[in-house]
């Protein structure tokens, strides 16, 4: 069963696996703490098996140094549903840090935000995408306080030539960040005078969570 699950598209999405020219897989994630198996970056099955084994351990793993069930909670919920894992057989874990974070976000819906191109910056010619986590009973005014999930390049050089080469070839590392929406709205709308388009996504409560 585990072998078949390692071939599932959702498992590949969770681990950011992409097919390689040689017929294998390699994850786009570079953080060593993102993988539980030594060869997890290139072996979906090994990572799956080690992930399942880690659920039965109290060892602290990952960048956040938490038990595997809490550090990789999306993997856990998917595998629990697919394998019918009995939680009573696992070491008890409350995942307080995750639940406190989720309570702060208080997600009720997700909106896709598209700031259009910024003419003074060629690197923005295709615009940008980010997600806004909207809360229940949110108004037009309070939506500015909602959190966003953003992925962007970690620009390490202000040299124009280096910036252009690394930007076009994917030479910069990418990172996720979470900020209140008013910060991004001010950056894109007020400072750069971009048009900002919003698209409410049709997601189920489980997908939103």
Report each predicted region and the residues it spans.
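Short, compositionally biased low-complexity segments
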Residues: 24-26, 46, 184-187, 206
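Structured, non-membrane catalytic/scaffold regions adjacent to prosthetic-group chemistry
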Residues: 87-92, 128-129, 141, 204-209
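Glycine-rich catalytic cores of cysteine/serine-nucleophile enzymes that process amide/ester linkages
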Residues: 108-194
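Active-site nucleophile-His-acid catalytic modules used for acyl/amide transfer and hydrolysis
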Residues: 185-209
């Amino acid at each position: 069963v585990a072998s078949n699950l390692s071939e599932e598209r959702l498992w590949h999405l969770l681990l950011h696996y992409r097919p390689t020219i040689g017929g294998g897989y390699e994850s786009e994630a570079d953080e060593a703490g993102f993988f539980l198996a030594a060869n997890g970056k290139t072996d979906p099955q090994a990572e799956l098996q080690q992930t399942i084994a880690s659920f039965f351990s109290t060892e602290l793993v990952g960048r956040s140094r938490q038990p595997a069930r809490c550090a990789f909670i999306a993997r856990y919920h998917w595998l629990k549903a697919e394998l019918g894992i009995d939680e009573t057989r696992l070491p008890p874990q409350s995942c307080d840090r995750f639940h406190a974070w989720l309570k702060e976000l208080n997600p009720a819906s997700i909106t896709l935000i598209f700031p259009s191109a910024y003419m003074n910056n060629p690197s923005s010619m295709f615009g940008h995408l980010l997600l806004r986590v909207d809360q229940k009973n949110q108004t037009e005014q309070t939506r500015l306080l909602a959190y966003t999930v953003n992925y962007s390049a970690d620009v390490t050089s202000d040299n124009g030539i280096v910036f252009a080469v690394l930007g076009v070839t994917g030479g910069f590392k990418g990172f996720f960040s979470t900020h209140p929406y008013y910060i991004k709205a001010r950056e894109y709308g007020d400072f750069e005078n971009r048009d900002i388009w919003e698209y409410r996504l049709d997601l189920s409560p489980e997908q939103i969570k």
